A protein has these predicted regions:
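Phosphate-group recognition and catalysis centered on beta-loop-alpha active-site segments
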Residues: 2-281
Length: 281
């Protein structure tokens, strides 16, 4: 009988040790990086206009200089997207392809800046802007969340984007869906607030992202690579791993909001198609 209880106790102890090790490993994977109050302050309680203050009827196109001007004048923060043209210019544009916004069947990275300049956004007189042109329009009036789009020249995009940011005196942070892009800033730009964009597993493109990778991305299991200081998660259900990361200190950023109630429980909100208050905390 004593041997039975001894074996049971040993088995329970082994189970506890294994469970503790597994729990520690999981926490290691999802733990965020630390950030300072100064880094967080411009974005805390801030409503950021998604791709600028563009309009539903497209009379003010997304990611246009006019959309960014309107957002800055209203006092909102700004979210925007950067990627490279064929000739290595950092341009502000969301999609990989030009079909939806410009009506041209081509990829952004297949055209030079001069070729992109000939296109119009949503049939208006607005053109695809350079990142530097957007910063010239904003003039340090808005906190900017800069998303780096995943592509074939990520290192070049990171280097050129950071070079531009380094010459700007306004408040900017970066984010990306690709943890390796976020990790580049972890090791090369420690002064810059960085965030991991994520969404539920089912939202990733099954044609380009495998199921295991989509699961890991959706549960922010690559945080150990980038140690993001905020998690920008699609508004809706957030898995336990994301909530634990937030509990451990990651700023809570939600996208894309279409109603003011999404401010609840978040530190920063990325919104579109309505005009919320500028600051909510």
């Amino acid at each position: 009988m004593k041997d039975y209880f001894k074996r049971a106790a040993n088995a329970a102890l082994r189970g506890a040790v294994i469970g503790a090790a597994a729990g520690s490993a999981a926490l290691f994977l999802i733990a965020p990086g630390s950030s300072t109050k100064r880094q967080r302050a411009p974005f805390m309680g801030t409503n950021c206009a998604h791709r600028g203050l563009h309009s539903r009827d497209k009379s003010v196109p997304e990611n246009s200089l006019e959309a960014f001007r309107l957002a800055a004048e209203a006092g909102y923060g700004i979210e925007l997207d950067v990627q490279l043209s064929k000739d290595g210019q950092v341009v502000v544009f969301h999609d990989d392809t030009l079909d939806r916004v410009c009506g041209v069947h081509a990829r952004v990275d297949e055209l030079t800046l001069s070729e992109l300049r000939e296109l119009r956004l949503c049939g208006t007189d607005q053109t695809i802007p350079l990142f530097t042109e957007v910063l010239d329009v904003v003039r340090c009036r808005s906190a900017i969340i800069c998303e780096l789009k995943d592509g074939k020249r990520n290192r070049e995009l990171c280097e050129k984007t950071y070079e531009i940011i380094s010459d700007y005196s306004g408040d900017i942070c970066i984010e990306s869906f690709n943890p390796l892009i976020v990790a580049w800033f972890r090791f090369h730009a420690k002064d810059l607030l960085r965030g991991q964009l994520a969404q539920p597993m089912r939202r990733y493109d099954a044609d380009t992202v495998s199921a295991p990778t989509a699961y890991a991305l959706g549960h922010t299991l690559f945080n150990f690579i980038a140690r993001p200081q905020f998690i920008a998660y699609r508004i809706g259900f957030r898995p336990l791993s994301v909530r634990l990361s937030e509990y451990m200190g990651a700023m809570r950023v939600g996208w894309t909001s279409h109603e003011p109630r999404n401010e609840a429980g978040r530190d920063t909100v990325i919104f579109e198609f309505y005009k919320p208050r500028v600051k909510f905390k």
